[in-house]
A protein has these predicted regions:
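Short C-lobe core helix of eukaryotic-like protein kinase catalytic domains
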Residues: 421-425
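Nucleotide/phosphate-binding site architecture used for ATP/NTP-dependent chemistry
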Residues: 1-419, 446-590
Length: 590
């Protein structure tokens, strides 16, 4: 690849298109979060003015449930000094810096994230457009690598600060380029391997790597007069080796606490979360999740060595809870367990930092089960994020699945809700247990376009038990969190209603497939059906009212605009919430 080839996707027409799409999203989501207050000009047309009042953006929009602004990208125009001027996302954030609450310190870093997001969109625009109907029938990894929007709420959602253009082209999930992981030997005095029930280190590594590869790696150690029995093997993202470990952990390499063994044989595909890899060579083998010290959507994407120690136990506990609960079992819910984990402690950095520091999250990995072996005849897999994916003609994958299924839109939706939403309700009301159930964290099992069951993932880092009195095994105690009573239900209202159903309902309504009222009526009916089936939890249903008239608006972009390097204090995540006013509960009237 030549120097100019690396930026061939950055053409004027693609850049203009990417800017228009991003400004559309910014107008919609920042208005939703009440950072912007568009002036109505009549007939669905609105104006937003810059901080100095000299620039104005005009556009048409439909306002839907949950104060969702569906902005028409083609309608957006920008005017200054009486003349129309080209759209520029970077200018947009500078012109509205004060309105958006961007400090002088954060602004340039945020602009860098916006530039990276725009560049990523330009790359995606070079790929042939895949119709939603085709994606609805595509294989698991084709769907995964075809996602174009990223998180539906966050505007700067593809920052990946730390990736150069060559690394973007090598490792970004949308490029779908196969990756071989780097393997290190880590001295047992600094490293720890933990695993779930029935998993033993030596046999597990041989199953994942193959006996020949393990022997090859051991030979590298023996050639340096090192004993393989003194070391644990750790998979590493290639970027992390080249950019961090080879420099930041130089002392560990020099002391032979870390030894680079080379690349593994299997080829992997990066998933939407960037640092997790699917085994393309052997799809039934485990995913590998690695530490990656790039900034993306408000966090450095490292992995804590300390957190890894309890990860398998937490997954085993949740899997057992699901297995023992007849309601969860009846929905078909499962998790793909994080079966094993390994972490490396750099003693000097630990002395110099607190437990939340990125320096403690540079070298760790976990192995997560593949969902492929669980498939039955005729079933396929798709990231739930695909439901809100819209192709270049405005057609959604959810709409395509409904057409493929032959079911009425309401019946299709009901089956999806019973598979995905009912388990969330029951986990909350029966166990005070919550997940992070956004589109990228859920895999749907489909058959003939119909959702059969849901698979939740990213368990140990994301689940929480909000009951101070719940009896938990010592190894699982970490998931207990203290959350104010009045914000507990935001785990449903924000994470599910506002951050996912809001977009799904709007897309189906826009396509003329399912009216918004019918969408939310169905959500209400599924909720009431669950509650009716569980009379023993009636007091809980009253205490935490799913049919309350309104709920607090929790703003995600405000977190990132305030601090895009670490948008949540990990010591007090609920305390970081940006609650701005309320939203009308769309199921309250049903």
């Amino acid at each position: 690849m030549t120097l100019s080839d690396a930026v061939a996707h950055l053409s004027p027409h693609r850049w203009a298109r990417a800017n228009r799409l991003l400004i559309r999203k910014a107008l919609a989501e920042f208005t939703h979060e009440r950072l912007l207050s568009p002036e109505a000009d009549g007939e669905g047309r609105y104006t937003v003015r810059s901080d100095d009042g000299l620039t104005r953006y005009t556009f048409t929009a439909v306002i839907r449930a949950l104060d969702h602004w569906q902005v028409d990208a083609e309608s957006i125009t920008r005017h200054r000094d009486g003349a129309e001027v080209p759209l520029s996302a970077l200018d947009f954030f500078i012109e509205l810096q004060k309105s958006l609450g961007l400090s002088d310190e954060i602004l340039p870093v945020y602009l860098e994230e916006i530039s990276s997001t725009l560049s990523g969109t330009c790359y995606k625009l070079t790929k042939p457009a895949v119709p939603a109907a085709e994606l609805a029938r595509a294989d698991f990894q084709t769907v995964e690598t075809s996602m174009t929007e990223g998180h539906p709420c966050f505007v700067a959602n593809n920052g990946r600060l730390g990736f150069g253009i060559h690394e973007y082209l090598s490792y970004a999930p949308e490029t779908a380029n196969p990756v071989r992981l780097v393997w290190l030997a880590a001295h047992r005095s600094r490293a720890a391997f933990t695993a779930g029930a029935g998993v033993e280190y030596e046999s597990f590594l041989r199953e994942e790597l193959g006996g020949e590869t393990v022997e090859r790696f051991h030979a590298v150690l023996r050639e340096q007069d090192l004993d393989p029995a003194d070391y644990l093997l750790i998979p590493v993202h290639p970027w992390q080796w080249w950019n961090k470990l080879s420099v930041t952990f130089a002392a560990e390499v020099a002391r032979r606490n870390l030894v680079c063994l080379g690349e593994g044989d299997d080829e992997y595909l990066a998933q939407q979360s960037i640092r997790t890899f699917f085994n393309r060579t052997s799809p039934t083998k485990h995913y590998v999740k690695t530490a990656l010290s790039v900034i993306n959507m408000g966090f450095m994407r490292g992995l804590s060595a300390a957190y890894m120690e309890a990860t398998p136990a937490i997954n085993d506990w949740l899997a057992q809870l699901i297995e023992n609960d007849p309601v969860l079992r009846s929905t078909g819910l499962s998790i793909i367990r994080e079966r094993a984990a390994v972490g490396y402690r750099h003693l000097e950095y630990e002395q110099a930092t607190d437990r939340y520091s990125p320096y403690r999250k540079m070298l760790a990995a976990l192995w997560r089960e593949s969902p492929v072996p669980s498939l039955r005849e005729g079933e396929s897999l798709a990231t739930m994020a695909s439901l809100v994916h819209v192709d270049d003609q405005g057609a959604s994958v959810a709409g395509a699945l409904i057409r493929q299924s032959g079911l009425t839109p309401v019946e299709w939706l009901r089956r999806y809700l019973q598979a995905y939403f009912t388990p969330l309700l029951h986990s909350f009301y029966a166990y005070d247990l919550v997940y992070m159930p956004h589109g990228e964290n859920v895999i749907l099992v489909l058959k003939d376009g119909v959702v059969q069951r849901a698979i939740y993932k990213d368990i140990a880092e994301e689940i929480a038990v909000m009951d101070a009195d719940a009896v938990l095994p010592p190894a699982v105690e970490r998931v207990r969190v203290d959350v104010p009573e009045d914000t507990k239900l935001l785990s449903i209202f924000t994470d599910v209603f506002d951050c996912f159903f809001r977009f799904l309902a709007a897309n189906l309504a826009t396509e003329g497939i399912l009216a918004e009222d019918d969408f939310w009526r169905t959500v209400a009916e599924v909720t009431r059906a669950y509650q009716k089936s569980m009379p023993s939890l009636a007091d809980r249903f009253r205490q935490y009212d799913m049919f309350a008239p309104e709920f607090a608006l929790s703003c995600l972009n405000r977190l990132q605009l305030r601090n895009n390097r670490q948008m949540v204090d990990l010591a007090d995540p609920s305390g970081a919430l940006q609650l701005i006013g309320t939203l009308k509960n769309p199921i309250a009237g049903f």
